[in-house]
Amino acid sequence: MILSNGEPIKCTHSEPLAIYISGGITGVKNWKDIFMAAEQDLILHLHARFFIFNPVKIAKDLERSFKVNIGRMPSYTDYMREDIKILAMCNAICMLPGWKRSKGARLEYRIAKILNMQILEWQPN
């Protein structure tokens, strides 16, 4: 279930809620499955106008672009720059379990706080 300060999420924005999913990737064996499960849970439980930005899909698009235009895979820095650019367009972030162990997720959390985004926490059922 998705939580925000212990309460179910409510869309309080007049505009659609854009949610960026954040969590550990480096060193997490099944990170793609975790991110996809969180996205599916958001889709199933939130009955409002939402856009969900999932780093699994962002990474695929970035890798495709790099292969075609640059001829190499993106670096960690390249992934983070793309993720931060997309995060900055959102008005909410959904933190996955274990995010505090991830340098990138901690940075994304700090950016979300600075940009006054709604911060959500996701726990699998």
Locate each region found by the language model.
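Conserved catalytic or regulatory cores that recognize and/or transform ribose-phosphate-containing ligands
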Residues: 1-125
